[in-house]
Amino acid sequence: MVRILHASDLHFGRPAVATRLASLRSCIERLAPEAVAVSGDLTQRCLNSEFVRARAHLDDIRRETPVVVIPGNHDVRWLGAVARNLSLFGRAAHEFRYSRYHKYISPDLDPVLEVPGAVIAGCNTAHGISRGSLTRRIRDLGVIGHVSGRDLKKVKEAFAKAAPDAARVVMIHHNPIKGEDSGRHGLANTSQALRAFASLGAELILCGHDHQEAVHAVEEEDFGLVVSTAGTISNRIRAGRLSSFNLVEIDERELRVTTYSWQNPEGFTPSRGHSFPRRAGATA
């Protein structure tokens, strides 16, 4: 069996809560997952000081557990890159957009982590204000994401190189399932993305962004996909929901997702669980 602790939206900066971050760290030590997956929004305002704190937190976890992390929309310098996106200097715009993430976290926006029993392919969906993320609503500018062909190709390559018996997991930032409280999808191309991930053999999608914990099963390309949406570790909770993270457990027969919710003074404790049969022919 492989265990993946899935957290999201840490939002280092004013929304970060030290006691919750400490409890998350304690849970990682106690649960001893094979991997920790952080699906973006490490910072609140993409500030250098916030990235420094986020990096220190990730390094602390990495001393004992492998970590895979991707950027979220709050980690992108999207506002300052608007003019650059409209210019001919596309490469310069790209480098500016992710410059602080590259400096403090990683040069890789689509990282891959393989552990015994699973491969986690990061797929960047946080592109700031870009053509693929545009919708008809002004409020979506810089907030909504999309799955690009380039990033999808990297997922395909990661799965092709992975062990045949490894569970295929994709990690994105933006939620492909409409939030119960927000009523919004996080992706501009949700349907296409889900079909593409299913066609590549993915069994599980990890995401965040919506600040609302959720677990869904969807049918795409004649295959079932499980979507684990982690809540936020910060105080930027939605509609009175509790801060939370998800623990994923995958064995030969089942894929289980347990939500751990914040309780004061106990810390993060199990609150609900979901179980799904594995895709036919899959092993872990």
Set out the residue ranges of the language-model regions:
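Conserved beta-sheet core of the metallophosphoesterase superfamily
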Residues: 182-253
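N-terminal active-site segment of His-dependent metallophosphoesterases
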Residues: 1-64, 144, 150, 157
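Active-site environment of divalent metal-dependent phosphoester hydrolases
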Residues: 13-16, 44-49, 53, 73-81, ...
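A short C-terminal boundary segment appended to hydrolase-like catalytic domains
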Residues: 249-284
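Active-site neighborhood of phospho(di)ester-bond hydrolases with catalytic His/Asp-centered motifs
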Residues: 7-8, 36-41, 66-73, 169-173, ...
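Active-site-proximal segments of metal-dependent phosphoesterases and phosphodiesterases across multiple
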Residues: 130-146, 153, 161-204, 210
